[in-house]
Amino acid sequence: MVILLVSGPVSRRDLLCDTAIQILAVEGGRGLTHRAIDREAGVPIGTTKNYFPTRESILTACAARMTALHQAAVERLRETTPPAINASDVAELYPALLRRAVADDPTQMLAMVELYLEAVRRPGVREALSGMVLANAGAGAALQQAAGLPSTVRDTGLLDAYFLGVAISLLALPVETLRTVGLDDPYALGIGVFSATVPSTDAGSGDRSVESG
């Protein structure tokens, strides 16, 4: 599940984190500096360094911010899930999430990829991201169980891992390559990552095509 940045007033700390997330998405980890965040956030030079003295503290704060936003989104999903939800309804979420993550606004997905890479070398980032993974797996399992599926956190954790891999491929590979290997239909891919972890479910029609542009 992909996080969306919240609208409305935010604290200066959150503003700096949101700005850093945008920079990660656009310029990658190498573009993430204290001065770059200050400039993009429109705050006096030195502000970011006062809040986050080291680069690692910036990255850890970004991961924590994304986790907090994600957990808020998960809570909203819980609150708005209709009682009569079924397996097909749940399956249909994934093509929509994939399209949003790749075509509509890839900022969060691109930043997440950068943070995953940083987490390999930085325990603080790794710990912050683990909260997002655990919250998502738990919420996904609860949602699928509400739809009558015997899903576990392992199933939904695997689903999220599949989703992340597919999203990265769609963002990184040329259209011709995606077409050649059969990864050019976001709708089918969204249904596919769901069905791959819930093999007993005949969810979705599987024959709809959603334009990736």
Model-found features: residue ranges?
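Secondary-structure edge/capping motif, primarily at the C-terminal ends of alpha-helices
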Residues: 81, 119, 170-174
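Solvent-exposed, amphipathic alpha-helical segments
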Residues: 15, 19-26, 72-76, 80, ...
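Amphipathic alpha-helical packing segments from all-alpha helical-bundle domains
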Residues: 103-113, 120-147, 157
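Hydrophobic/aromatic-rich alpha-helical bundle segments in the mid-to-C-terminal region
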Residues: 126, 130, 145-213
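Short, basic, alpha-helical segments at the C-terminal edge of helix-turn-helix-like DNA-binding modules
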Residues: 64-70
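Helix-turn-helix
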Residues: 15, 19-61
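Hydrophobic alpha-helical connector segments
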Residues: 74-109, 156-159
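Short, intrinsically disordered or compositionally biased N-terminal tails of bacterial proteins
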Residues: 1-7, 150
